[in-house]
Amino acid sequence: MKYVKLILRLLLGAFMVYAGTSHLTFNRQEFVAQVPTYLQFSPTFTDFVVLASGVVEIAFGLGIIFLVKNWRAIAGALLALFYVAIFPGNINQYVNHIDAFGLNTDNLRLIRLFFQPVLIFLALWTTGGWKYWKLWAKGKFFAEQSGKAERKE
């Protein structure tokens, strides 16, 4: 199971680096079209949202590949939160029938929506991010971190 987790984590990290790079280059306009209308204050801001999310995706991808255990787990938990945060863009694509990334039917766009929980699960499971996800859910993450700092002093 250890090697399955490792391989899936490396694949997820590579996927994130690829996706982030595509935000910055060859799929940029398709990502611009996917930005929900409530974030489209201006064309410049919409483009900024796409570019910023691309940089964040690259950082997460590299983080879950190269960071050491505890930092990797934090990166995985943050990546799961990122997947939750960008989910409205996927819903926007479905609701407004936006063709992008080969998703040119409502059925394909709907199927994509069901893959978001899979990505959230993979981010948490392959990195060990469950621990931090649970602490955040209970509102205890910062208390745990400050307790570690106090014990080290």
Segments predicted by a language model, with ranges:
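Membrane-interface extramembranous regions
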Residues: 1-153
